[in-house]
């Protein structure tokens, strides 16, 4: 029996307030952390796109495998309340460890702004994520069921409304966290150097998880807490195992066949349990194709976020971060669920179309497939604008003439003529082994060979200002600038060292005819102040303005002098800004969200309606398992494919889901809907009749024999 004090508010148990707040905070914590994860792997730890995607989906798969463990612990050992509290503690510790792992200064022993022992950060990250997966997955099947336990008989209406509020809390937590945590990430923090503030962005979700735990424990005295009733899932597994073994033992032709393979369990298990398991396995069979949907759906947080990093986030007056695009899904879900229930489905019914649950799920798969076709189209547009960076056995070189006369630079197979204060036409790519000689010449001057050990896999700028005066500068950018920022470096063509301030950042002691390192800036124009002790006249304006910076570009500013002796800026583009707008992702998010509404929500309703009353948790665990398998599919396909073009991977996933969609439609065509309540009622009637017969026999007085 459940034990609690009787508290109520507007006909609802007061205890559900604590459960709803707990769920909101927990979902904020989970989705806030998850929104950052792919960029944390890519930019902080430094993994490439494929490895980052693989680890991300491994983590998500674990989060959906551990609910089975949570259900087992709750049903057969601790009960729901103690399971939620215990695993929430594990969850909170995991979030805290992940936040600590992202502290840049933790291993920055030489204080240069870069972690000196990445393995420490990786190890802490993996420990933290493992604890989070155990915590979030373990409590997943318990919290909503624990909320449902708080209602009395006759409160079905309030219970149904509770689940609607509960679902709203999930989406509200997801929506707010995916807006807030990327905003925290773009701030800069650190002791020795200012870097993207992952500790704050991970720390806030960790704090919210602690709040979630505290709120849940505060309501302890108001909850109905039921003792574990035994492990239904264990009974199901044992019954299926016995049926298979018994069938194998009686496989010879001398034993008559039985109508269903589960009927081979009748020697040990009662017909009611066998009938219930038949209903469950019938639905589980339909689950087989479902993981393919989740394989596509969960790439919103990995591949689609990485896609957004190469796009422009300027949408009207808004500046959208790549990981904030995931909020489109949460916003559309909150809007579309009531629209589908109140408008779309009733209209379809009025048109006389029997839009069954399985038909809806088929449509959901098709829409998700089309979402990935849209993603591929967007990717093709992005690819047209992306710079090509050198491979491991290549180098890229461009020539920048900061002198007063034209210069000729000869490379193997090419001669480049660069006029004064201009650059060659972009970066030229050379195989390291074939880059045998580079020579500089100009009219009336001898040929001067360039001697420099070019580092393969990197870009280089060859600064020239006279035939015998040159400098090779290794560029520090081998990818688009992160977070949609803009990389800016300065080249000093004057004969003295300069200090340069741009916005709130300082370039200290940029020596003569040399380049600074890149520093990164947000959108807009910035003031540039040049400090000099000799060459620049005091009468000159030393505050200049940059160009209007956009998303994801890189520029070199060469500081020269006008005829008046005053400084002037010459701007050269190193990496062009992102031109494909993130708004182009909205159609693919719209399609995937439509697919989610008609697939996921309908799938849960279908599973609930087709499951026996005591086995709904078994089907819930099976449903969550399809999500885990879907993420494993991403690992297999992405790992085996190794596509050179991302759009091709999107098309592959779309094609796979389309094939699965057809298979599922055929399976659904032959599925017969059942009413578990009617079947169980029939068993109840049969048991009642048998009991009545037994009572009749027990009331007959036996005839006693007289002893002679």
Curated annotation (Swiss-Prot):
UniProt lists the family membership as follows: Belongs to the major facilitator superfamily. Proton-dependent oligopeptide transporter (POT/PTR) (TC 2.A.17) family.
Q: Which GO terms describe its biological process?
A: dipeptide import across plasma membrane; protein transport
- Annotated Pfam families: PTR2
Gene symbol here is SLC15A1
UniProt GO MF annotations: dipeptide transmembrane transporter activity; peptide:proton symporter activity; tripeptide transmembrane transporter activity
Record keyword Protease present? no
Record note on domains = The extracellular domain (ECD) region specifically binds trypsin.
UniProt protein name: Solute carrier family 15 member 1
Query: What residue spans carry the region label Extracellular domain (ECD)?
Result: 383-585
Q: List the glycosylation sites.
A: 50, 117, 408, 439, 495, 499, 509, 514, 527, 539
Please name every pair of cysteines joined by a disulfide bond in this record: none
Q: What's the subunit arrangement here? A: Interacts (via extracellular domain region) with trypsin.
The residue spans the entry assigns to the Cytoplasmic side of the membrane are as follows 75-82, 140-161, 220-276, 349-361, 606-619, 667-708
> Its function?
Electrogenic proton-coupled amino-acid transporter that transports oligopeptides of 2 to 4 amino acids with a preference for dipeptides. Transports neutral and monovalently charged peptides with a proton to peptide stoichiometry of 1:1 or 2:1. Primarily responsible for the absorption of dietary di- and tripeptides from the small intestinal lumen. Mediates transepithelial transport of muramyl and N-formylated bacterial dipeptides contributing to recognition of pathogenic bacteria by the mucosal immune system.
Classify the protein's membrane topology as the record does.
Multi-pass membrane protein
Q: Give the stretches traversing the membrane.
A: 1-21, 54-74, 83-103, 119-139, 162-182, 199-219, 277-297, 328-348, 362-382, 585-605, 620-640, 646-666
Question: Domain of life of the organism in this record?
Answer: Eukaryota
* Annotated Gene Ontology cellular component terms: apical plasma membrane; plasma membrane
Its predominant location is membrane
Q: Which organism is it from?
A: Canis lupus familiaris
Please state where this protein is localized: Apical cell membrane
**Can the keyword Glycoprotein be found in this entry's annotation?**
yes
Q: Which UniProt keywords apply?
A: Cell membrane, Glycoprotein, Membrane, Peptide transport, Protein transport, Symport, Transmembrane, Transmembrane helix, Transport
All ranges on the Extracellular side of the membrane: 22-53, 104-118, 183-198, 298-327, 383-584, 641-645
Q: Which InterPro entries match?
A: MFS_trans_sf, Oligopep_transport, POT_fam, PTR2_symporter_CS
**So what does this thing catalyse?**
a dipeptide(out) + H(+)(out) = a dipeptide(in) + H(+)(in); an L-amino acid tripeptide(out) + H(+)(out) = an L-amino acid tripeptide(in) + H(+)(in); L-alanyl-L-lysine(out) + H(+)(out) = L-alanyl-L-lysine(in) + H(+)(in); L-alanyl-L-proline(out) + H(+)(out) = L-alanyl-L-proline(in) + H(+)(in)
